[in-house]
Amino acid sequence: MKFKHTSVLLHETIDNLKPKNGGLYVDATFGGGGHAKYLLSKIETGTLVGFDQDEYAIKSAELNFADLLQPDSEPRLKLVHDNFSNLEQDLVKLGYSDGIDGIYYDLGVSSPQFDQADRGFSYRYNARLDMRMDQSQDTDAYQLVNTLSQKELADILYQYGDEKFSRQIAHRIVERRKDKPIVTTFELVDIIKEAIPAYARRTGGHPAKKSFQALRVAVNHELDVLQASLEEAIRILRPGGRISVITFQSHEDKIVKKIFKKYSEVEVPRGMPFVPDDMKPTLRLENRKPITASTSELENNNRSHSAKLRVAEKL
């Protein structure tokens, strides 16, 4: 499979990391390797470790970056087929236990995952309900849709997709599966359309968009994994090291903003004459407001419209 994908906020993400020769960097979401290729072009020496839980992305990278993966005294690129929640553990296995100089995340589903019909991510193609980033994972969208209670389904659709008709959709799903399991993406799309009022179906894009997003987030535990990974990444960053995070959904951005705030701001008790070392901030925000795509990128890459980039430096 060719894992072609147009990287969003390419220069902004990598340039803000300020990569330096000899550094150790982590691409937490390797995908098509666009950000990785640009970062490696900025340094003559140093190593990038690319993580991706998608087997197809790793196999594609092994072909497209074969010249950089050849073992030598100082490998330029190493690939890890794993979720970015296991950053430190996997880095130690590779022999990197002294921290990293930079890390970046490009969150969300990549274009090839949407375009590969049998992955079940998209409401545009008819396929078995799947939505697993990691194909070795047991739980998929089919299981959630056919086993969760009406309340659990409604909560997922509302919390992860901001779907205001979550209760109606969840009710219709539970009623339909009484007759037979809901197997395919198109079956689910039809159920969603039936549950949403006609006036709402005519506005705001595809009626199944929010529900499919919510199920994908739930299947892959995206928000829990993101929060745990960011905490770990900040801990293993060396002083002066930087972290860049691109988000596409409001709930993702809220998590990044909250964690960056937690480590960059200090609440000193009233009357305390100085700030103890264990209360001092460990991050400095590079940008108070998120960086967004330029006019040129917005015109050439539709995926960039909702992208937000936040950057911070380890103190």
Swiss-Prot record:
Signal peptide: none annotated. InterPro entries: RsmH, SAM-dep_MeTrfase_MraW_recog, SAM-dependent_MTases_sf. Residues 290-315 are annotated as: Disordered. Its main location: cytoplasm. It catalyses: cytidine(1402) in 16S rRNA + S-adenosyl-L-methionine = N(4)-methylcytidine(1402) in 16S rRNA + S-adenosyl-L-homocysteine + H(+). Specifically methylates the N4 position of cytidine in position 1402 (C1402) of 16S rRNA. This is Ribosomal RNA small subunit methyltransferase H. The gene is rsmH.
